[in-house]
Swiss-Prot record:
Protein name: Mitochondrial 2-oxoglutarate/malate carrier protein
Positions where N6-succinyllysine occurs in the chain: 57
Catalytic activity entry: (S)-malate(in) + 2-oxoglutarate(out) = (S)-malate(out) + 2-oxoglutarate(in); malonate(in) + 2-oxoglutarate(out) = malonate(out) + 2-oxoglutarate(in); succinate(in) + 2-oxoglutarate(out) = succinate(out) + 2-oxoglutarate(in); maleate(in) + 2-oxoglutarate(out) = maleate(out) + 2-oxoglutarate(in)
Major localization class: mitochondrion
Gene: Slc25a11
Pfam families: Mito_carr
Annotated GO CC locations: mitochondrial inner membrane
Subcellular location: Mitochondrion inner membrane
């Protein structure tokens, strides 16, 4: 008699056993949250820089380093972690959705023989996952922008949210639930730009380095390609990011919003602050992008390995 096969053993389609979809989503969020603990200060500095000099006012911060030292001096070490609860919730919503959907689509579109999707299909998967995550994430994004911006304002103008949940409840009660999705379109646009730019620029950068003859296909080459990719991605996405930041932080003036739409933000920034102000906060944005991506995938890889070892081995 032939032995009865154990559940999941000897997959007929040739694909290896994998974790349930719920676990993929969970690990994606946890990985992003772990990375955020390390890069939250850079997020805060980037947001402060993007709001500095808004509306033709004098810039509070001359450089990113000046912003960091000013925040430490005025608000203390704890001040650079302002908005951490919102940053964690953003990862729990945006990154959970983005990485979960990406992993599910990637596995579904992988061939029966294990052949991964081609470059264009990968790019489409990445943009779809990014845009979907960006639709889920705005409530936490709005809370994060406002919480990190509070410290730069005079005491009588601060919103004074105690934590992300207090922020969400107050925003919904005082300004209406739709305000939680303010800036949703530029947030989704940024996600598409970031995912497309990262994939395309990393692939091209790696190929350029290999073709130069000075690099082999090793960790040094991958690191340099990531840094070049981060530079391209930052340059491409920052104008959209500053639109998102300004819209999500804006107040009502005489019952009218400060900005009509994203295009109005772009025109006012260029008119009153200069064309290159669209790239305010470039340094902390770039410095955050690489480490956050690397840390997220390190945490994700370790959790996946642990799950396979504990639940899928044998």
């Amino acid at each position: 008699m032939a032995a009865t096969a154990s559940p999941g053993a000897g997959r007929m389609d040739g694909k290896p056993r994998t974790s349930p979809k719920s676990v993929k989503f969970l690990f994606g969020g946890l990985a992003g949250m772990g990375a955020t603990v390390f890069v939250q200060p850079l997020d805060l500095v980037x947001n402060r820089m993007q709001l500095s000099g808004e509306g033709a006012k004098t810039r509070e911060y001359k450089t990113s380093f000046h912003a960091l030292t000013s925040i430490l001096k005025a608000e203390g070490l704890r001040g650079i972690y302002t908005g951490l609860s919102a940053g964690l919730l953003r990862q729990a919503t945006y990154t959970t959705t983005r990485l979960g959907i990406y992993t599910v689509l990637f596995e579904r579109l992988t061939g029966a023989d294990g052949t991964p999707p081609g470059f264009l299909l990968k790019a489409l998967i990445g943009m779809t996952a990014g845009a979907t995550g960006a639709f889920v994430g705005p409530p936490a994004e709005v809370a994060l922008i406002r919480m990190t911006a509070d410290g730069r304002l005079p005491a009588d103008q601060r919103r004074g949210y105690k934590n992300v949940f207090n922020a969400l409840i107050r925003i919904a009660r005082e300004e209406g639930v739709p305000t939680l999705w303010r800036g949703c379109i530029p947030t989704m646009a940024r996600a598409v730009v970031v995912n497309a730019a990262q994939l395309a620029s990393y692939s091209q950068s790696k190929q350029f380095l290999l073709d130069s003859g000075y690099f082999s296909d090793n960790i040094l080459c991958h690191f340099c390609a990531i840094m070049i990719s981060g530079l391209v991605t930052t340059a491409a996405s920052m104008p959209v990011d500053i639109v998102k930041t300004r819209i999500q932080n804006m107040r009502m003036i005489d019952e009218k919003p400060e900005y009509k739409n994203g295009l109005d933000v772009l025109l006012k920034v260029v008119r009153y602050e200069g064309f290159f102000s669209l790239w305010k906060g470039f340094t902390p944005y770039y410095a955050r992008l690489g480490p956050h991506t690397v840390l997220t995938f390190i945490f994700l890889e370790q959790m996946n390995k642990a799950y396979k070892r504990l639940f899928l081995s044998g």
